[in-house]
């Protein structure tokens, strides 16, 4: 029964990942999340049910639009598969229903923010601020850490990034501060320190590899959000 539920969560994650793709594409552009329906951004072709199957339709169509032949962005199957695997992994590591629900919500926020930052270089207030609020709410109703730890974690996360911004005169932004505040609100101050340290390591290594592969200039801005999100997921699952 446990395996069946895990498989169900994986499938749910695939479906939710499909919705997250809509948010990732439309929210930064100021578009409605409801209208118009899913369509090819190149030719406007409205997608049919068979073209909306998570991961499967991408493979079936060989990564191209059936109408115009335009390449479908790799992000679509990546987000769907990542969310499916993530949902199943969170169930595997959760010891209670409340921990599972909180984990799924937190992971969902991280996925959306990471890919928006990766593509657009922003971390929208429409997601970060409600994310902080949800972290506080779960603490208040007793589903996670004590309220004082949630509040302290959010303040520490926000304050650390703001301090770095002021001292370095750039390099990070207020969106990064709010994302780390989300981490603190959900997981507490210890998670903030862990995530900031390992995100810095991951961001440095990843940044060097990115510049080497793309041959871009060292002044090219590299989003920090994905590194923080990755470190936060590791903390959520294993610590």
Kindly label every feature range from the protein language model.
Residues 1-4:
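Short, strongly hydrophobic alpha-helical membrane anchors
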Residues 6-21, 80-85, 165-170, 181-239:
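Alpha-helical transmembrane segments
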Residues 9, 99-202:
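Functional transmembrane core segments of multi-pass inner-membrane proteins
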Residues 20-75:
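Membrane-proximal soluble regions of multi-pass membrane proteins
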Residues 25, 87-91, 110-117, 135-142, ...:
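Structural signal for membrane-spanning alpha-helices in multi-pass inner-membrane proteins
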Residues 30-31, 65-76, 115-129, 166-178, ...:
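Interhelical loop and helix-boundary elements at the membrane-water interface
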Residues 89-102:
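Transmembrane helix-loop-helix
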């Amino acid at each position: 029964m446990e395996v069946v539920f895990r498989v169900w969560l994986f499938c749910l994650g695939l479906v939710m990942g499909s919705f997250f793709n809509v948010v990732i594409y439309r929210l930064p552009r100021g578009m409605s999340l409801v209208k118009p329906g899913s369509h090819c951004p190149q030719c406007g072709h409205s997608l049919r049910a068979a073209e909306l199957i998570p991961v499967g339709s991408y493979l079936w169509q060989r990564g191209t639009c059936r109408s115009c032949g335009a390449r479908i962005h790799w992000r679509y199957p990546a987000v769907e598969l990542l969310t499916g695997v993530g949902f199943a992994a969170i169930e595997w590591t959760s010891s209670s229903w409340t921990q599972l629900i909180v984990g799924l919500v937190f992971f969902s926020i991280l996925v959306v923010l990471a890919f928006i930052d990766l593509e657009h270089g922003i971390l929208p207030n429409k997601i970060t601020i409600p994310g902080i609020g949800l972290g506080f709410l779960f603490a208040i109703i007793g589903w996670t850490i004590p309220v004082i730890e949630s509040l302290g974690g959010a303040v520490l996360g926000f304050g650390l990034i703001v301090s770095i911004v002021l001292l370095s005169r750039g390099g990070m932004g207020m969106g990064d501060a709010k994302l780390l505040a989300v981490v603190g609100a959900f997981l507490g101050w210890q998670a903030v320190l862990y995530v900031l340290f390992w995100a810095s390591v991951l961001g440095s290594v990843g940044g060097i590899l990115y510049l080497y592969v793309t041959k871009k200039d060292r002044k090219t801005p590299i989003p920090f959000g994905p590194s923080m999100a990755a470190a936060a997921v590791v903390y959520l699952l294993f610590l």
